[in-house]
Design a protein with these regions (language model features):
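Catalytic core of soluble alpha/beta enzymes
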Residues: 142, 152
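Catalytic alpha/beta active-site cores
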Residues: 1-138, 156-171
Length: 171
């Protein structure tokens, strides 16, 4: 009935588990639940320094979330790959896109190494970008990111157009 967006990263899997437990307790159909956890640990390492586990263990948790949600909570956005914090940490618009798409590609490659279907988990990836006050630069950034992400996903084996979409929000 209500989509919940949780800006939580290293402990995102715990909050997701609590959310699912509450949904079960209140009789909700997990196949209909919608929401998002940020769950972007690579950004945490690069831009914020707020992480719990080393990168390898963190990537395992993230790909486990991709796999579990695809089966149990298929409308859940399993990650919001964040350029916002990268930009706030001092990057340019170009660097924001470069680092964010690079992180996104790393998540996709980790999921593929786990033999997950890119056309399934790819539809649940989302992005979060910063919008500074140069309107034309920001519009160009978003358009370029959209095209680059589609190409990255296609090169990694996506065939479903929805899996190649760059779904994002900005602030």
């Amino acid at each position: 009935e209500v989509s919940s967006s949780m800006t939580i990263n290293a402990s995102g899997f715990i909050l997701l588990a609590l959310y699912v437990a509450l949904a079960k307790k209140t009789g909700r159909d997990l196949k209909k639940i919608t929401g998002t956890i940020q769950n972007d640990i690579l950004k945490e390492y690069a831009a914020r320094g707020t992480y719990i586990y080393p990168p390898k263990a963190s990537m395992r948790i993230i790909t486990d979330i991709f796999e579990w949600c695809a089966k149990e909570v298929p409308k859940w956005n399993t990650i919001s790959i964040s350029g916002y914090h990268i930009r706030e940490a001092g990057s340019t618009a170009v660097q924001e896109i470069a680092f964010t798409l690079s992180n996104g590609k790393a998540y996709v490659q980790a999921a593929l190494q786990k033999s997950l279907d890119i056309n399934i988990f790819g539809k649940r990836l989302s992005f979060f970008f910063n919008a500074h006050n140069n309107l034309f630069e920001e519009v160009a950034k978003f358009r370029a990111a959209r095209r680059m992400w589609a190409r990255i996903m296609k090169e990694l084996g996506a065939t479903d157009p929805k899996a190649m979409m760059l779904r994002f929000h900005t602030q």
